[in-house]
């Protein structure tokens, strides 16, 4: 448990289930700590190795930290903004409020009200920034290049899986309509019969309300006679190794906040075909690292995947380009440093 006197940045996480926002926090905080940022989390659903405040320690927020005149409350959800506002305005704690917005939709009146009370706002993409009505800084997410990296060992290849074929094409994330899993499966049913060297894998959690959706996809695969070549893996213990096993990754989301999976795939030296949901179009260089199509357009998605399935060497070449692109533009340290600059602008000068 960190000493509240040493904590200058509080990153609340008020959601128990794993989400894209939670994943961002989990990846960012260790990197921020390595950069010397004095940050701690608050809330459930985070790994035990992250510095985590107890709720009772919030009483210590009335006193500024040892080196600064105030702290930064870095919210990423509405409820986290609301708590920050209460702590500052109701209890008069010396806090500066920061919000990171990934949403790509018109905000509700309530969300707009919350955002207007922030001292600074970060947008995770130009597209998400276009929905904000307040000044903001665009800082795109990065990826941990130490965790997501190209194949290094035999276990990183398709042979280690025991699956048929020479190449894997994958779609990862929760299995649901919003994520476009059905569009991927439909494309695989159309393309794989002509290309026996490829096998497709779907990995991700199926929540209770989406079981019928997943069961329908599995039934479609069986009806197509492809149950040995389109596999549903469920949740796997380590998704990173599966990225390394892929020759092509597909991100077919109909709707997305930011969307980290293309970065994770490209960092693993894997070409990517994606919809234009989330920030995907800002991450992928069409014709060099992959391809981007309109969200919800299953036919366009299939057409974009087809050249890679027909020519695996093209996928390999674009995977090499993707790795260089991510290393040059999307290292996690780059994101952490940019956020650190926003923190410093809010914290002000050190206490004398």
UniProtKB/Swiss-Prot annotation:
One of its GO terms (molecular function) is glycosyltransferase activity. Pathway: Bacterial outer membrane biogenesis; LPS core biosynthesis. It is an enzyme of class 2 (transferase). Its EC number is 2.4.-.-. Disulfide bonds: none annotated. Keywords: Glycosyltransferase, Lipopolysaccharide biosynthesis, Transferase. Gene3D superfamilies: Glycogen Phosphorylase B. GO terms for biological process: lipopolysaccharide core region biosynthetic process. It comes from the Bacteria. Belongs to the glycosyltransferase group 1 family. Glycosyltransferase 4 subfamily. Acts at transfer of mannose group to a 3-deoxy-D-mono octulonic acid (KDO) via an alpha-1,5 linkage. This is Lipopolysaccharide core biosynthesis mannosyltransferase LpcC.
């Amino acid at each position: 448990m960190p000493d509240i006197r040493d904590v200058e940045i509080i990153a609340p996480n008020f959601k128990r289930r794993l989400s894209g926002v939670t994943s961002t926090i989990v990846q960012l905080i260790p990197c921020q700590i390595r950069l010397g940022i004095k940050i701690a989390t608050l809330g459930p659903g985070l790994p035990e190795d992250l510095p985590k405040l107890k709720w009772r320690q919030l009483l210590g927020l009335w006193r500024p930290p040892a080196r600064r005149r105030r702290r930064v409350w870095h919210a990423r959800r509405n409820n986290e903004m609301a708590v920050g506002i209460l702590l500052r305005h109701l209890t008069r704690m010396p806090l500066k409020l920061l919000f990171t917005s990934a949403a790509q939709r018109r905000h509700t009146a309530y969300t707009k009200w919350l955002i207007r009370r922030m001292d600074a706002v970060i947008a995770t993409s130009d597209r998400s920034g276009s929905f904000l009505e307040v000044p903001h800084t665009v800082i795109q997410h990065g990826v941990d290049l130490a965790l997501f990296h190209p194949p290094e060992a035999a276990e990183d290849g398709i042979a280690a899986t025991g699956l048929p074929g020479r190449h894997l094409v994958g779609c990862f994330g929760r299995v649901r309509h919003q994520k476009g899993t059905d569009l991927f499966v439909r494309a695989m049913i159309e393309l794989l019969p002509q290309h026996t060297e490829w096998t497709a894998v779907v990995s991700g959690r199926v929540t209770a309300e989406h079981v019928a959706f997943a069961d329908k996809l599995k039934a479609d695969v069986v009806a197509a006679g492809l149950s040995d070549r389109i596999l549903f893996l469920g949740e796997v213990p380590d998704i990173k190794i599966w990225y390394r096993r892929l020759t092509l990754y597909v991100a077919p989301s109909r709707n997305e906040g930011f969307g980290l999976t293309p970065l994770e795939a490209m960092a693993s030296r894997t070409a990517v075909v994606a919809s234009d949901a989330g920030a995907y179009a800002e991450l992928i260089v069409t014709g060099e690292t992959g391809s981007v199509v309109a969200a919800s357009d299953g036919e366009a998605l299939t057409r974009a995947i087809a050249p890679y399935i027909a020519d695996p060497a093209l996928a390999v070449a674009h995977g090499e380009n993707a790795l260089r692109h991510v290393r040059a533009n999307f290292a996690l340290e780059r994101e952490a440093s940019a956020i650190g600059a926003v923190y410093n602008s809010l914290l002000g000068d050190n206490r004398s």
